[in-house]
Amino acid sequence: MEQTATTKQLLEQYYSGFARKEGWETVLSDDFLFTGGDMTRPEPLVGKAAYRQVIDRFSRVFDAMRVKEMIVDGENACVIGTYDFTFPNGARITGDVAEIWKARDGKLQALTIFFDTLTFQKNTPA
């Protein structure tokens, strides 16, 4: 039971910072694994710095986010996040992202995301 609370606390801290666009990276492991956003590249990006670059780009298009649902089972979790986006072309869209997490040794270790990539392609320049 202790591990479930720890994973939930890590996620709560991550999303609190993520919504503010600051302080979220403190709960990530240094060898953090991120998979998502490009179905043609299923291998994960490795490292907190590589993930930070992804989030720096992503932060330009999301205005707000909130956790819609969180299910935690030991070191595993699934979060449905609702994001409000404003794209460079002016389109404003609210959408959900499924986020599958793994924690290890008191840090968030891995994240795999699933979302509507076609909407992103249609609304962002190449």
Residue locations for each model-derived region?
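Short, cysteine-centered beta-strand-loop-beta hairpins and adjacent loop/turn segments enriched
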Residues: 60-61, 85-93
